[in-house]
């Protein structure tokens, strides 16, 4: 019996050592420590969008007609529809209208990140407004808070994963203080850990989202 007890104790010690060596995966993306500031709020009575389109089409094929979308204040509007319904085409046109405005700070996050990003740039080059030391330090700190490694910060955007590219868009919108966001499936490339955190950031966003 003593020999058996000694063997059991030895096995317990081995399991304890193995548990210490195991990597524990977090339940949430704790490293994402960024968010939009209060200065991105949109007044409740402000008209953000008064958009009408007689006909929505792609390559000459009609998808819909007599569209009207009116958005006021800090509304969060979701455009739903099956694949091929023209959601992306519609969002591009809405973004085109909003990006021309001087009374709001609009941003557009497309499904295809290459539409609006020079993929030969590094994340630091994409985000930095100048080459001053304080600006570069700020950008690198934000990238670190979004779980970019020092190595990833020096890679070309094209070499990054879809999730890292998506985070780059969010950082750009945050650093630019955008208060109106046009987002085309913004969370589709995020991991199961990052996704809920990003959705929480969007839910708390005090500006307007389409």
Predicted regions and their residues:
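Coupling and communication elements adjacent to P-loop NTPase active sites across diverse families
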Residues: 1-59, 72
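ABC ATP-binding cassette signature C-motif
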Residues: 42-210
């Amino acid at each position: 019996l003593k020999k058996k007890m000694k063997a059991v104790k030895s096995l317990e010690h081995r399991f304890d050592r193995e548990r210490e060596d195991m990597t524990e995966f977090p339940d949430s993306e704790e490293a994402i420590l960024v968010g939009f500031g209060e200065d991105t709020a949109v007044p409740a009575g402000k008209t953000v969008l008064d958009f009408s389109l007689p006909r929505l089409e792609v390559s000459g094929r009609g998808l819909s007609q007599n569209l009207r979308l009116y958005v006021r204040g800090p509304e969060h509007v979701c455009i739903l529809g099956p694949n091929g319904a023209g959601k992306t085409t519609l969002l591009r046109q809405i973004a085109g209208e909003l990006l021309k405005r001087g009374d709001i700070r609009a941003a557009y996050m497309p499904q295809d990140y290459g539409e609006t990003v020079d993929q030969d740039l590094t994340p630091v080059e994409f985000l930095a407004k100048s080459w001053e030391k304080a600006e570069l330090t700020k950008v690198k700190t934000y990238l670190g808070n979004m779980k970019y490694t020092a190595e990833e910060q020096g890679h070309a955007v094209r070499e990054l994963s879809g999730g890292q590219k998506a985070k780059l868009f969010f950082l750009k919108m945050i650093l630019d203080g955008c208060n109106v966001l046009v987002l085309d499936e913004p969370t589709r490339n995020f991991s199961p850990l990052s996704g809920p955190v990003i959705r929480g950031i969007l839910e708390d966003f005090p500006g307007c989202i389409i």
